[in-house]
């Protein structure tokens, strides 16, 4: 079974550049890994995606121009529908509809899921089916009941291939709640010491 991500990404021109730069042999081994299943999610990929609150999605217009969009929502807004399929609700944004328009012409997407604190990146190729508001059975699996945003449609993505990327040149970034988890013990300790100091000052004899 081929390495699905490499089969899509490593075109003849890409392989030519790999040859010129001396990396072709290592990627040839990657392509020849037996029983590759990198188009079906394991617990590792499913858990990683479920832990994200954003990702990047690339589409291509009918004129051939690529377009990258940031997609965000509550943690877990990208739903794992099965081992080959993910989906998410399309919340109303700036109403340019560039990605939606592109997908009506070409259903292929490239996705980047990022974990900045752990310098981890999951790349994915897929094909999108746009889900209308009349498909409530599907949309109900994509809704976030505790997130106040208007849903205009759903995206269901059939995974064609994925690959974990190296951590080089990914710089750590942290959400406020992630920083709070680290600084909370320090803040509590500072408050404790300040209170102890205040008591000591109050109990000390006046000069």
Task: Locate each region found by the language model.
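Binding-site signature for planar aromatic cofactors or substrates
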Residues: 1-207
């Amino acid at each position: 079974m081929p390495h699905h991500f490499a089969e899509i990404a490593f075109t003849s021109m890409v392989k030519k550049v790999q040859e010129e730069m001396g990396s072709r042999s290592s990627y040839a081994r990657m392509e020849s890994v037996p029983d590759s299943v990198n188009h079906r999610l394991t617990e590792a990929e499913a858990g990683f995606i479920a832990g994200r609150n954003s990702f990047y999605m690339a589409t291509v217009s009918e004129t051939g121009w690529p377009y990258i969009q940031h997609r965000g929502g509550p943690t877990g807004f990208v739903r794992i529908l099965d081992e080959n399929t993910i989906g998410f609700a399309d919340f109303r944004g700036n109403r340019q509809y560039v990605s939606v328009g592109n997908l009506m012409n070409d259903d292929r997407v490239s996705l980047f899921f990022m974990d900045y604190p752990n310098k981890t990146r999951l790349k994915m190729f897929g094909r999108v089916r746009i889900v209308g508001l009349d498909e409530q059975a599907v949309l109900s699996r994509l809704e976030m009941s505790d997130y106040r945003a208007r849903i205009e449609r759903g995206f269901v993505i059939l995974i064609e291939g994925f690959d974990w990327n190296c951590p080089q040149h990914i710089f750590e970034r942290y959400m406020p709640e992630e920083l709070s988890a680290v600084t909370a013990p320090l803040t509590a300790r500072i408050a404790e010491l300040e209170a102890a100091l205040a008591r000591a000052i109050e109990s000390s004899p006046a000069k």
